[in-house]
């Protein structure tokens, strides 16, 4: 092969290794990004689905539960059976002897077998025990006019609004056959949280603890965490690709400029 010359060019040290490493890193990063997005979608949609099964939203039209729940507030009620209701719960119920065409939101202060009266030193008493009610409006007393001692029949509930002076609650129905009480079976939900405006979960009614166990909070916080974490993973995983490509292009330009300067 006369007349021909062979010129061998040595590969640049480290060039192939750098490119291979970048490709390997990019592939791993893309896989992790895909996993993050998939997990995020599962958490996000799973949180919404769980919430739809467990909770039902309600809009409270009156101020009878102020300051716990104001008129127009949007709340989440955990779907429960009436036998799950405990003292201190804020519940949603329907009783046509109270309101014919709407649900009502009030606080349970006594259950079947309890004796409720008002007032001892300005406090509501249940089974002779004065109840500490920090959720009442500032400066408000629990004292109500024309509130005789009531023994709650089995299977029924005695309910009051937190804004005692203006609430049409059990005290407004004392002359009814049920003495102002409501059947447990009328309850459809227990209010866990106020979601609009975002006041968060209701405080536990610890003043009733001496009379028996309180209801356990629902999964509102867990569901909220799932939705938020899922959203973060979807956004973070989805943003990885464009950011990684931008960084790769920046590194490539840097290597090209460095090679041209040699």
Regions found by a protein language model. Give the residues of each.
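Extended hydrophobic leader/signal-anchor segments used for secretion and membrane insertion
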Residues: 2-262
């Amino acid at each position: 092969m006369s007349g021909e010359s062979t010129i061998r060019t040595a590969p640049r040290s480290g060039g192939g290794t750098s490119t291979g490493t970048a490709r390997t890193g990019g592939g791993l990063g893309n896989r992790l990004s895909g996993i993050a997005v998939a997990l995020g979608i599962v958490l996000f949609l799973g949180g919404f689905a769980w919430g739809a099964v467990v909770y039902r939203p309600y809009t409270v039209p009156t101020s009878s539960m102020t300051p716990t729940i104001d008129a127009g507030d949007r709340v989440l009620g955990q779907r429960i059976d009436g036998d799950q209701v405990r003292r201190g719960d804020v519940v949603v119920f329907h009783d046509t002897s109270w309101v014919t065409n709407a649900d009502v939101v009030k606080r349970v202060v006594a259950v079947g077998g309890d004796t409720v009266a008002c007032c001892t030193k300005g406090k509501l008493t249940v089974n002779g025990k004065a109840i500490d009610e920090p959720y009442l409006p500032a400066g408000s007393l629990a004292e109500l006019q024309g509130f005789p001692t009531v023994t709650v029949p089995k299977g029924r509930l005695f309910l009051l609004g937190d804004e005692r002076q203006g609430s049409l609650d059990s005290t407004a129905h004392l002359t009814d056959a049920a003495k102002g009480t409501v059947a447990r079976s009328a309850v459809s939900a227990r209010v866990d949280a106020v979601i609009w405006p975002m006041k968060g979960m209701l405080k536990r009614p610890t003043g009733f603890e001496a009379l028996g166990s309180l209801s356990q909070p629902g999964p509102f916080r867990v569901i909220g965490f799932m939705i938020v974490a899922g959203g973060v993973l979807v956004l973070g995983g989805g943003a990885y690709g464009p950011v990684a490509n931008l960084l790769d292009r920046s590194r490539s330009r840097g290597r090209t400029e460095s090679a041209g300067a040699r």
